[in-house]
């Protein structure tokens, strides 16, 4: 599970959110990755001086985040009316100097060059991609950055869905995530996300399984320990109810067909058979 900050919009509240995430990481059995979403939205008091807000987050808050070990990644919302490619690059470059890799939000509404910049800077993932050009796909093919689709966000906002079929047919991998947040995707239901991927994004059931497991693990840099049932990896997995086929798992959208949740070999949901 990845948990992002980004809703504090000032030093005290961003650090508070990240400290809460750090505590959850220590107390919860599920693997948690924390992301400092430094450039998420522009506070009203910085409406006409965005550069000052970027300077605050990059040059004042980020060093404290790094010093206290509060983030596994940084993130920015690179979009018209929010943060520019140059501002995103400023954050990524500063974080790299402090040993923190990046994950970024790009191409949700407009194509402004964020994908190319993120791939050149070895971002771990690029999230959204509802708008995607052939040039963006070619850039992604040359890099090691995971495209991530967020279909529940498209559903809630009634915007186009990430062209997953186009991405896969181009020879690229794709991951799926809920984008669970109060503004654009108020649902953490991964079952629904997977069904949307099949229904709205024309993904095949086996592609959805791969996107929501191993590729999702890669997007969080835990693919060596999680994401597949493999010798040497942690025994964290789900067991479904009896099904006639893999497709049935996503066909009955809104249904929970998970019988057991196992985390590192221990059943945390469901009963032992």
Task: Label each PLM-derived region with a short phrase.
Residues 1-112:
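Metal-coordinating catalytic core of metallo-dependent amide/deamination hydrolases
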Residues 46, 249-251, 272-273:
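Short, charged, solvent-exposed linker or helix-capping segments at domain edges/interfaces
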Residues 54, 58, 194, 213-216, ...:
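Alpha-helical structural signal
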Residues 101, 111-228, 240-247, 253, ...:
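Active-site-adjacent C-terminal substructures of enzyme catalytic domains
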Residues 232-235:
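Loop/turn positions that initiate beta-strands
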Residues 256-273:
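Short peripheral tails and domain-boundary helices/loops at the edges of structured domains
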